[in-house]
Amino acid sequence: MNFETIIGLEVHVELNTNSKIFSPSSAHFGEDPNANTNVIDWSFPGVLPVMNKGVIDAGIKAALALNMDIHKEMHFDRKNYFYPDNPKAYQISQFDEPIGYNGWIEIKLEDGSTKKIRIERAHLEEDAGKNTHGTDGYSYVDLNRQGVPLIEIVSEADMRSPEEAYAYLTALKEIIQYTGISDVKMEEGSMRVDANISLRPYGQEQFGTKTELKNLNSFSNVRKGLEFEVERQAKLLRSGGVIRQETRRYDEANKGTILMRVKEGAADYRYFPEPDLPLYEIDDAWIDEMRAQLPQFPAQRRAKYEEELGLSAYDASQLTATKALSDFFETAVSLGGDAKQVSNWLQGEVAQFLNAEGKTIEEIRLTPDNLVEMIAIIADGTISSKMAKKVFVHLAKNGGSARAYVEKAGLVQISDPAVLVPIIHQVFADNEAAVADFKSGKRNADKAFTGFLMKATKGQANPQVAQQLLAQELQKLRD
């Protein structure tokens, strides 16, 4: 029997506001334990939450970017559960009226086709703290993360393969990153993914019993965990077994999923409206203000790069991987840079440098202006493509004018025949044996002179001009 795979994803995204959702404490990542806390985060008696308007702004932007309807009257709810990293014994979240609902995004599949994935809802909530279980037998609670604003984006169960889930996450991450509401760094926990997967016989409308997957700390692991579950569940069903509703975690070391707990039924969190927060009215003016702040998104930029600039689909995809890179590219082209040459540099030397340094393009000194200037002085023969690599490294580390650096460092390419011909004659005088080999007709003897000339000019001879002049002067020797 063959089975159809049914996948839905729940994605938690930390919003990059300066302060937390209901307290003035810093929401920044990486501080000492409990450094970013105050009485609200610790839930001292009598303290009240105060809404951070920037969180609602971010929620509206996310809803618009994901083609969602927006609840014009929005409220928060209490989700009741007890855990040490949740000092209130409830989480302030949204239940029946999330900020966004009925959305969708389009994904691109490996065969080049596209598919629309529906998004059920996107709701705002506060994050919980973090428990650390020490080797000394004690557990430690860090509430720096307590109250950091989240938006949870819940897809419909529209994905039919692990590959589609991977494509969905890639597209979702791009869109959220372009809005500027989150850096979506999985390694820092600002994007976290839970997956729900079930199988059903082809032709059956009713969903099978779902399994929830956790500990998915990369898109690659999401795909691997889902692939393992497809095989595990199919094997179990074919042998006459029954799928239990359970939560499993992906174990990277064993390349498989491991049981965490069996779910006897749906959790009863006893949601009720949060009495300490008012109803928030989101009018059209507020929505229009947030819409005006949204950029052009990756899909539209890719289409523009292919149709208007003549780039390949691959180049367009690489250049839109992040908004910062795409903005850099567009600025460089607007300054007169050739689109293909700018693209080649960004995907070649620039990408290699960023990977080696572990930096993003915003974190180096290279600018669109000095990259375009460098490309121009390659084109006019001031420097060679080989020398440009050295110039680029200087610009990436120090910034400034490419032309000014080339002139100051003495890197200007020698193209003047009046300068090169005497150097060629000196090369002949210094290498009599090579001249004798050439005159005697020894095979490939002429090729040695190119190296001699480049050494004599410290690599500054224009290769094209040098080859022409060498051929001319060698012919005179033969004559």
Curated annotation (Swiss-Prot):
Enzyme class: ligase
GO molecular function: asparaginyl-tRNA synthase (glutamine-hydrolyzing) activity; ATP binding; glutaminyl-tRNA synthase (glutamine-hydrolyzing) activity
A GO BP annotation: glutaminyl-tRNAGln biosynthesis via transamidation
Keyword Protein biosynthesis: yes
SUPFAM superfamilies in UniProt: GatB/YqeY motif (SSF89095), Glutamine synthetase/guanido kinase (SSF55931)
Domain of life: Bacteria
Residue stretches in coiled coil: none
Assembly notes: Heterotrimer of A, B and C subunits.
Identification of the protein by name: Aspartyl/glutamyl-tRNA(Asn/Gln) amidotransferase subunit B
Source species taxonomy: Bacteria, Bacillati, Bacillota, Bacilli, Lactobacillales
PANTHER family referenced in this protein's UniProt entry, alphabetically: GLUTAMYL-TRNA GLN AMIDOTRANSFERASE SUBUNIT B MITOCHONDRIAL AND PROKARYOTIC PET112-RELATED (PTHR11659), GLUTAMYL-TRNA(GLN) AMIDOTRANSFERASE SUBUNIT B, MITOCHONDRIAL (PTHR11659:SF0)
Gene field: gatB
Organism: Streptococcus pyogenes serotype M28 (strain MGAS6180)
Documented EC number(s): 6.3.5.-
InterPro entries: Asn/Gln-tRNA_amidoTrfase_suB/E (IPR017959), Asn/Gln-tRNA_Trfase_suB/E_cat (IPR006075), Asn/Gln_amidotransferase (IPR018027), Asn/Gln_tRNA_amidoTrase-B-like (IPR003789), GatB (IPR004413), GatB_C_1 (IPR042114), GatB_Yqey_C_2 (IPR023168), Gln-tRNA_amidoTrfase_suB_CS (IPR017958)
ATP-binding is among the record's keywords: yes
Swiss-Prot/TrEMBL catalytic activity: L-glutamyl-tRNA(Gln) + L-glutamine + ATP + H2O = L-glutaminyl-tRNA(Gln) + L-glutamate + ADP + phosphate + H(+); L-aspartyl-tRNA(Asn) + L-glutamine + ATP + H2O = L-asparaginyl-tRNA(Asn) + L-glutamate + ADP + phosphate + 2 H(+)
Free-text function comment from the UniProt entry: Allows the formation of correctly charged Asn-tRNA(Asn) or Gln-tRNA(Gln) through the transamidation of misacylated Asp-tRNA(Asn) or Glu-tRNA(Gln) in organisms which lack either or both of asparaginyl-tRNA or glutaminyl-tRNA synthetases. The reaction takes place in the presence of glutamine and ATP through an activated phospho-Asp-tRNA(Asn) or phospho-Glu-tRNA(Gln).
Family: Belongs to the GatB/GatE family. GatB subfamily.
Record's keyword terms, sorted: ATP-binding, Ligase, Nucleotide-binding, Protein biosynthesis
